[in-house]
């Protein structure tokens, strides 16, 4: 089972490898721009590089999620891709490989960008001592205004929440696309219906998470609320994965 999953994951990663190389190349260009400004002591270049890298990070994560969703949709629509679901591999293995591959891409990309910003920040703090004062003042301001202790542990949890939420959204997209291709296959406006269902699921999950935090007596954004959020989205992702695989298993095996 593990060997089959690994083969399927390699297949998924190979299909989307080229775009990741482009993302890596653009990120490296941003870093070259940053260190050029750093070496030449040009604050405008440093600021521009960090600003562009920030925008690119958000755009890259959006693109990775979008590409994963579109690849899955293509696999269900195109005959040569759809044949994958007719192989001896179970739909649970195939969908599992897709979910894990998407999760790996999101997590590794997020980690890579986070490390870049940590490295850039450390370099700046080492050279410009005044930034340490700004950093300390910013932490105090956030703590006073929002009652949030802005430490490294908290930032890591925030990054994890964002990445896990993206993985949940991708898996829910798989579910809605599968619904459109299976149980709604003969219905008019199936794409629109599945799109509406997707947004209803997103809103409902958000409300359910708020209710869960309220039920647990968590009224502030802190480490505990972030950990609960991560665990909640992991459970939602697992449920969406099982439901997606079940729907495909029922329809493809018929």
Residue ranges, per PLM feature:
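Hydrophobic alpha-helical transmembrane segments of membrane proteins
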Residues: 1-80, 91-254
